[in-house]
Amino acid sequence: MADTKIIAATLEVFQECEVRSFPVDCCSLLRHYGYKVYTYKELKMKNNELYEMCMGYSDDAFQDGCTGIIAYNQDKPAGRSRFSLMHELGHHVFAHVGNSSRNEREANAFASNLLAPRMAIHYAHCHSASDVAHIFEL
């Protein structure tokens, strides 16, 4: 996977969703692409069968392309949830089919770059991982 592919996809999302500041609003981005976003707790009340499928698949987040639902575990740290949500958006942006390790790496790289692009880290004058985590809510 080329860095240029990840950067180009990130810039496309920023432009299409008019992202102008950080931290990005993850749920707003997902809604822009037509997803309904629920916590696992909300999903359990709404559709227990889908909730059980989510829990069997991932403890972090789950995307159901058939229903247009993305759910995430509200009990995880907020930064982890944000990463998981943008990871799922990465699968959408790259039209991934299946869970190959390549697809997972690509979605991870996309999520990282979207949440805290290198250039934004530079211009935010981050001097430590703690600075990055604080400014970009990771």
Regions found by a protein language model. Give the residues of each.
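Active-site hotspot residues in diverse enzymes, especially metal/ion-binding acidic/histidine motifs
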Residues: 1-138
